[in-house]
Amino acid sequence: MERWSRRKFFLTSLASSFAAGASKLFGKEVQAGNGSNARAENFALTPPAQGVRPLIISSANGVNALDRGMEILKKGGDTLDAVVAAVMVVEDDPNDTSVGYGGLPNEDGEVELDASVMHGPTRRAGSVASVRRIKNVARLAKTVMERTNHVMLVGPGATRFAVAEGFEEMNLRTEKSRLAWLAWKASSSFNWRPGIDSPEWKEHMAALLDTPERQALLPWIESVIAHPPTGTIPCMAVSEKGDISATTTTSGLAWKIAGRVGDSPIIGAGCCVDNDVGAAGSTGKGEENIKISGGHTIVEMMRKGMSLTDACLEALRRVARNYNNDKKKLGTFHLFYYALNKNGEHGSASLWRSTRNGRRANYAVHDGTKARLAECAALFDEASGDE
């Protein structure tokens, strides 16, 4: 009972600090690419072209990375090379805490990464999960596809395979993510330093954030403690010839139980490609997507003639049905779907129109002219009730 009271106190007393909580998918700041911070207002929120090839799309936090993938597509490169190269920009960026280097750790303070790839032309797939100390797990999933007759490798075995294939082991935790984890431990434990409702909380945080640079992180730290991010980057592309590939890469749910695996590495859930039809991917609460095999559901709806946006909305309806459309329960999480088809058409839908702070859901599209943000459709045309 004491622990629940602490959390309720934390959520209510720090509500004004939560503006950063969903910035990756909704917010003003979209962090990606070469350590730079790209603000969403720098990207025109106008409808990108439909029916154009080549085309590459991703979640909003990939908007700065799509140029890299489009360069490959315009040179006639393989679609899987394009999407993996694009997400590696984000995996390499320590400022993006949703994937790769700098991703927020599990409850033990270890960064665990998941990823999957699907190659439409050869109808192959590769996947890795619960990988530690390897930064570019999308490329690792591609290596599993290319160098083994398996589809998925997990845990220490995946790390050993990566090292054998020449991947560099490294500490994936940055100072920023370490401080956030220490603060989370303090706010979530009975005995491991003062709780948020303790008189010693401010003193403890002052000692932890002992420089102006660290103190500037406090609003963000409080936000990610209250709303553990589920950030991810799915990316999919169609070539001029109509070939399709996709990848999804993530550091998963922040503060998760060690070994937890979400939907990102699950073929048919977080990533699905059929070269005859199209591709779909997701971000948000992976457990909900796994239960409906969302990626596969969307591709099959597209095969039956449903529009991309309607297919994404149908997947969200199936998620909502699992909760009898109870908005109070559904309001405790977010879920987003992204899709493109063989003709170069694209679409996306989110469970909620916006966060409770009013930020609307977007996704990133590059149609060969420039990368831009497009607005997601929404199952529920209102703000999330997420607390």
Predicted features and spans:
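Alpha/propeptide regions of enzymes that mature by internal proteolysis
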Residues: E2-W4, L11-F18, G33-E387
